[in-house]
Each structure stands twice: as structure tokens, then as C-alpha cells.
């Protein structure tokens, strides 16, 4: 929106960033994770306890489990803070939105918010979809317009955006502009292969924020080890919506980890993310979600790990006993963690 543009032009950060959790869809792609519908409902309750803005529940129609999840969520989930989102793709090549199965499934899921993924790279349109660029633009715009006509809030996940923009910026911007003009509520730029570094994320997000009159978000993966840094770079450039997963679960090496992203935005950058008083839920929720997916919590995870505020060296412990911030970058209680002293030979 115009306001976020002027904010970034003056170098100021956005006041608020929407946190969009995709643990239940993208996170579940991680090798070794297999979630039942019950698991997904329990995780959704934890995410609501944390207070994220959006919970992506799955892809209705992709499998029977996700259809069942949305049916049961409608009656069993009593969400206080979060909105449930159904995920799907744009209409198929040469198809008609009115009888498109995927779009129909999205509406049947009954959520107020939907997120659709579509190709935002000329190469993927011509090579993977084997269709023309005009049809690539139309597939996205038609789908957004159709879902908006049914009263939905619509997020557009611009697949392969960063690689596509590097290769053919004009086409990628055409797709985004078409989605915005069709009424998209947020354009989410996806680093689908996860190969981008923060400098590229920042400059490309800045370009898009300047070019479109629409909220811009980012969806990042951790293949370079820069998932969290990339998310922060996106916000610095004007993104007001971040998609990621709790504990960084996700395909290959994972999605960007919302746990340090939320903590960094709130504590280091002064950007509002969770409802007032909810930051202290970060540690218990991160650990609870780990339990629900049957993974051990990472003791070295920033902010919430068991050793994140554990002090072993004698010099550290004597200094910290006198003054906490001597060796702690934030007060651990802020994120629901605590200080620990370990016996050391030092």
C-alpha cells in the first residue's frame, strides 16, 4: 500500500508484519514428518496460542487428510487470534475458473482466507507449463479475480519469483501487477529453490514494493543458511507479511524459522508481530510443536533452545551473576526461556 511505500522510502521499517505459518503444509514436507489430522489440529491450537496472524492448514483436495482437516477445523477449532488459510494453485492451463477443481476445493474448504501459488518465472511458464507468457499472466489474474468474487481474502504466492525476476524481470512484474489489479490482498514473493542471499532479497523486494500498489510478503527457504536473514532483509525492504514455519521445518533443509524471525523483528527491530504479551509463548510453543511432530527440540535454536542462555565459562558466570546483560543479548524471560549456569573446567 502507499503507506508502506513512503515508510520504506524514508528508510523506516513497517510498523507491523503479519506472521503467516505454513508448518501444517510446507513444514509437513520435511522428511520424517507424518502428521495425522489430530496432530494438525493440535499444532493449530499451539499456533493460535502463540498468536500468529495466519495458519495455513493444507491443500484441500490434494489428499483426503487435508479435506478432513478443514471439515473438522470448522467445528473443532476455536481460534482466538489466528485465521485459518486454505492453500491451492491457480487454474490449469487453458482452463476455466468456473469449473476448475482446485479453485472449487479452495472455496469448499470454507475459510475466509485463501492462498494460491502460481508461476512467476517466464522459464517455468514456457518450460514447465509449456504455455505462452500471456496465458501465464491470465492464469494468475483469473484465479485471483474468481476467488475475490466469492468474498475471499486472497494471497498470491509468486513461485520462483526471485529467480524469475533475475532472468526476466518484465514478465515477473507483469504477473504481480496482474494479480494486484485482480484484487490480490498480498503478493508473496517466493524463493522457491532457496538459493537467494539477503542482498538479493532486499533489492528485489524493494523493486516490487515501489512498482505495485499492494502489500508485499516473502516466503523463504533455508538452503543457503540465510532463511531468517532473508526474511529480515525482506522486511527492511518493505515486506509486511512473512511466511515460514515453526522451528524451520520444511522440504530439503527447511523453510525460514518463524521463531527467531518473530523474536528479531520484535526485540531487535521494534516491529510488531504477535499480540501484546504473547512473545513469552515462543519457547513453550516451539517445544510443544517439536513434540507434536515427534522431533527433538534443537538445544541450540536461537532464543528458545535449552542452551540459548546457558553459561559455562567461569568468567561469564561470575560476571552475569552481577549483571545480566553482560553476557545475554536479551532477557530470556521475554521469549519464555531462562538462564542456566553450567559447571565448567574454565
Question: Which stretches of residues belong to each language-model region?
Answer:
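A mid-to-C-terminal "edge-of-domain" accessory segment
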Residues: 8-17, 23, 263, 269-346
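Alpha/beta enzyme core
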Residues: 19, 29-54, 70-79, 92-216, ...
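Terminal or standalone catalytic/regulatory effector modules within metabolic enzymes
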Residues: 42, 52-64, 68, 331-346
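Acidic, glycine-rich active-site loops and adjacent beta-strand->loop/helix elements
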Residues: 61, 88-93, 120-121, 160-163, ...
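A glycine-rich helix N-cap at a beta->alpha junction
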Residues: 80-87
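Glycine-rich phosphate-binding active-site loops on the catalytic face of alpha/beta enzymes
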Residues: 118-120, 236-256
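Histidine/acidic-residue-rich catalytic or RNA/ligand-binding cores of hydrolases
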Residues: 201, 253-260
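Small-aliphatic-rich amphipathic alpha-helix that forms the alpha element of a beta-alpha
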Residues: 219-246
Amino acid at each position: 500500500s502507499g503507506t508502506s511505500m513512503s515508510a520504506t522510502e524514508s528508510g523506516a521499517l513497517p510498523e507491523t508484519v503479519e506472521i503467516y505459518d505454513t508448518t501444517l503444509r510446507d513444514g509437513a514436507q520435511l522428511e520424517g514428518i507424518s502428521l495425522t489430522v489430530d496432530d494438525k489440529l493440535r499444532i493449530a491450537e499451539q499456533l493460535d496460542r502463540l498468536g500468529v496472524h495466519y495458519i495455513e492448514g493444507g491443500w484441500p483436495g490434494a489428499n483426503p487428510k487435508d479435506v478432513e482437516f478443514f471439515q473438522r477445523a470448522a467445528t473443532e477449532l476455536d481460534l482466538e487470534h489466528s485465521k485459518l488459510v486454505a492453500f491451492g494453485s491457480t487454474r490449469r492451463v487453458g482452463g476455466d475458473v468456473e469449473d476448475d477443481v482446485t479453485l472449487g476445493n479452495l472455496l469448499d474448504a470454507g475459510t475466509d482466507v485463501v492462498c494460491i501459488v502460481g508461476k512467476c518465472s517466464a522459464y517455468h511458464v514456457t518450460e514447465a507449463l509449456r504455455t505462452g507468457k500471456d496465458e501465464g499472466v491470465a492464469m494468475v489474474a483469473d484465479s485471483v479475480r474468481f476467488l475475490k468474487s466469492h468474498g475471499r481474502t486472497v494471497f498470491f504466492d509468486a513461485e520462483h519469483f526471485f529467480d524469475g525476476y533475475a532472468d526476466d524481470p518484465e514478465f515477473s512484474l507483469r504477473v504481480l501487477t496482474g494479480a494486484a489489479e485482480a484484487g490480490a490482498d498480498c503478493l508473496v514473493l517466493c524463493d522457491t529453490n532457496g538459493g537467494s542471499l539477503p542482498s538479493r532479497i532486499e533489492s528485489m523486494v524493494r523493486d516490487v514494493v515501489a512498482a505495485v500498489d499492494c502489500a508485499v510478503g516473502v516466503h523463504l527457504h533455508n538452503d543457503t543458511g540465510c532463511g531468517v536473514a532473508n526474511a529480515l532483509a525482506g522486511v527492511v525492504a518493505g515486506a509486511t507479511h512473512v511466511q515460514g514455519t515453526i522451528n524451520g521445518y520444511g522440504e530439503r533443509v527447511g523453510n525460514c524459522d518463524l521463531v527467531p524471525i518473530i523474536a528479531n523483528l520484535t526485540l531487535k527491530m521494534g516491529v510488531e508481530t504477535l499480540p501484546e504479551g504473547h512473545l513469552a509463548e515462543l519457547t513453550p510453543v516451539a517445544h510443544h510443536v517439536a513434540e507434536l511432530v515427534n522431533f527433538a527440540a534443537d538445544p541450540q535454536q536461537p532464543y528458545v533452545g535449552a542452551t540459548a542462555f546457558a553459561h559455562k565459562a567461569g568468567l561469564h558466570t561470575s560476571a552475569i551473576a552481577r549483571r545480566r546483560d553482560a553476557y545475554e543479548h536479551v532477557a530470556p524471560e521475554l521469549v519464555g526461556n531462562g538462564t542456566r549456569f553450567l559447571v565448567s573446567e574454565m
